[in-house]
């Protein structure tokens, strides 16, 4: 997950499209560049990214979730490169590269006249003031969060799937509307994720809600690397093929080292010996239905 510093929030609200585009582009370029480096993974990765703009209290909090497999294609596309156990890419390197790429892209957008400055931000339209305003961004650590999914890949997809076509808050978090106040639940990460009520005036609630309306036609789910729209048609089947070959090779090594182990190939029901009749690749497993259970005669 890549998060923009809170210092950028006012600028984001006046320049949603350009800054959200920069967030997508620079976070993706960071992952691709660091993963490609032979000192880290040395592979071409593929991933999809989902934009979220809200915090639990509905304040502006732009960040992107990136769902990345633990590996990628070798530079010559002949093998699948696996990441090390419990380690994918160095967090500190990702933070520094992301920070540098985003601030550089922001400076370029300013030089190209793409940014809008209104109200309290009007003075930032002056180059020397904008440059001074940017300096603290170089000195702080930007938030990059890496975590292996607790419940596996399916859980991650289910979690993100709840938000892909919703905005900011779902109905089940709304508690009450009494005397001109809207109360909703929020999770306090500083207090063991306890759920707490937050009462807001109607005006304040609507203001916070409207912060998260995206520009018309904005695409909030994007694919990169070997999942990019123009590349996945050829590269995704190759990934399945290489993943299948790699897993089959590992399975054969495992069988060779354990096939004589006592009781390994015994039926858990009757205790009789079992024999391997077929091995399936991951792609084949996904395409097959589970075996039917036939009733005993």
Predicted regions span which residues?
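Beta->alpha loop/short-helix hinge microenvironment recognizer with preference
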Residues: 1-297
């Amino acid at each position: 997950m890549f998060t923009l510093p809170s210092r950028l929030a006012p600028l984001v609200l006046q320049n949603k499209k350009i800054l959200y585009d920069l967030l997508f582009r620079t976070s993706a370029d960071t992952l691709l560049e660091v993963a490609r480096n032979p000192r880290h993974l040395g592979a071409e990765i593929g991933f999809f990214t989902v934009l979220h703009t809200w915090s639990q209290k509905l304040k502006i909090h732009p960040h992107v979730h990136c769902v990345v497999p633990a590996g990628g294609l070798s530079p010559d596309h002949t093998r699948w490169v696996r990441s090390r156990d419990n380690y994918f890419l160095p967090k500190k390197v990702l933070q520094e590269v992301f920070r540098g790429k985003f601030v550089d892209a922001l400076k370029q957008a300013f030089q190209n006249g793409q940014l809008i400055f209104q109200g309290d931000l009007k003075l930032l339209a002056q180059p020397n003031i904008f440059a001074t305003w940017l300096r603290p961004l170089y000195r702080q650590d930007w938030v990059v969060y890496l975590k292996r999914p607790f419940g596996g890949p399916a859980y991650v997809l289910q979690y993100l799937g709840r938000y892909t076509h919703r905005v900011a808050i779902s109905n089940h978090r709304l508690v009450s509307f009494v005397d001109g106040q809207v109360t909703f639940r929020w999770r306090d990460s500083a207090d063991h994720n306890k759920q707490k009520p937050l009462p807001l005036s109607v005006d304040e609630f609507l203001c916070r809600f409207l912060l998260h309306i995206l520009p018309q036609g904005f695409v909030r789910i994007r694919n990169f690397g070997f999942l990019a729209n123009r590349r996945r048609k050829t590269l995704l089947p190759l990934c399945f093929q290489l993943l299948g070959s790699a897993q089959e090779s590992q399975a054969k090594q495992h069988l060779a080292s354990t096939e004589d182990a006592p009781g390994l190939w015994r039926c858990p029901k009757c205790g009789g010996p079992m024999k391997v009749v077929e091995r399936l690749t991951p792609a084949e497993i996904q395409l097959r239905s589970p075996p039917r259970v036939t009733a005993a005669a």
